[in-house]
Design a protein with these regions (language model features):
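Structural preference for solvent-exposed beta-strand-turn elements
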Residues: 1-366
Length: 366
């Protein structure tokens, strides 16, 4: 195997597949990338047995065909370190991969291609096309609310719902919930899958860099997202996602509208003196005024008043300050709306005049 390729043609794809490769070296070949050079171009593949990401690079100059596997991290780091206009030569010499450019040469150890696992792709009955940017935004607006290592394994991921007219993405860790939606025509009939946490994070990262149309297909076991450049395959989490609609609070609404940046900066200052373990913050609501208060066991405290548009009842409510901060960080509008249902019930956080994004945050006793 021997070929040459410019850094700009391979660097981005290499970084993306390297982030999928298994970092714990329990099975050494999973830390490697499969490189396959042939007439159609260069194929890069990485897997951790849950995710498989494949990239096809056509802009190479092929000298001889072949394939091998080499350390994902080391190869990505090396390519990242060379100047942008560098032309790299890859040559497989027995059990080592030689990479050279100008006066530089590196020799990498390889592992047998036969040891590299390739995903068994199931049958996919239907697929839907949508801009990668839209799916990336849905994941970005919800994934912060995913659980991590929860015994309720179905919470360690995001719910993807596809109906004939829209796609919904939902995430919850039991203390907060994020729901985002986009309108699109599909051939699906109210189908649901749960995408694992790492898969959701890697997919968002991928689609942020490839915002054009992608195709999505899935069955009960696998998700496939693909374009002309890449194919992303992920196993799914088995089981049923909880009926999240029951989490949305009911009752008399009391709406507060505010400048998002004003609330964020006040929260950031309050966070400095909040309890490091429980992360509590108190909202004191009065006519057109929101007082944000925090304290800690060292008898330190902070409070700040933020002008808001509010005509509801005066009351106090506590939250985990990190939950509010993370919610606001993915809201795109300059104006934000909090919808309260009393001091004992969850609160909604929304973009003003936008029903495609809803965050639910449970209250906290302070």
């Amino acid at each position: 195997m021997k070929f040459t390729v410019e850094k700009k043609e391979i660097s981005e794809a290499l970084s993306l597949v390297a982030s999928v490769a298994e970092k714990r070296q329990s099975i050494p070949v999973l830390s490697n990338i499969l490189l396959k050079a042939e007439k159609g171009g260069l194929t890069l593949v990485a897997t951790d047995l849950e995710i498989e990401l494949t990239f096809k690079i056509t802009m190479i100059e092929l000298d001889s065909e072949g394939e091998t596997t080499v350390s994902a991290r080391k190869l990505a780091d090396l390519v990242r370190s060379v100047p942008e206009d560098t032309v790299l030569t890859f040559e497989l010499l027995e059990s080592q991969l030689e990479i050279s450019a100008l006066k530089f040469q590196a020799d990498f150890s390889t592992l047998p291609v036969g040891d590299f696992p390739v995903a068994e792709i199931s049958e996919f009955e239907r697929e839907v096309a949508l801009p990668g940017k839209e799916l990336a935004e849905l994941i970005e607006k919800t994934s912060f609310a995913m659980a991590s290592q929860d015994v309720r394994y179905y919470l360690n991921g995001i719910l993807l719902e596809v109906s004939p007219s829209q796609i919904n993405v939902v995430a919850t860790d039991g203390h907060r919930l994020a729901w985002a939606s986009c309108k699109i025509k599909t051939d699906f009939t109210d189908e649901k899958i749960i995408i694992p946490r790492k898969s959701a994070i890697e997919l968002q990262k991928l689609l942020n860099l490839y915002p054009d149309n992608v195709n999505i297909s899935f069955n009960s076991n696998q998700l496939r997202v693909f374009s002309d450049e890449f194919t992303f395959i992920s196993k799914l989490i088995e089981g049923s996602y909880p009926d999240y609609e029951k989490v949305f609070p009911q009752g008399t609404e009391q709406k507060l509208k505010a400048n998002k940046s004003s609330v964020q900066t006040a929260l950031n200052r309050a966070a400095v003196l909040s309890n490091e373990k429980y992360r509590g913050v108190k909202f004191i609501l009065e006519q057109d005024n929101l007082k944000i208060c925090a304290n800690n066991p060292s008898k330190e405290s902070a409070e700040e008043e933020v002008p808001v548009d509010y005509a509801g009842d005066s009351f106090e409510i506590g939250f985990n300050i990190s939950y509010v901060q993370e919610s606001l960080s993915v809201i795109s509008n300059n104006e934000v709306e909090f919808v309260f249902f009393g001091s004992e019930n969850s609160c909604l956080v929304k973009n003003i005049d936008d029903e495609s994004l809803i965050h639910v945050i449970m209250p906290m006793r302070l």
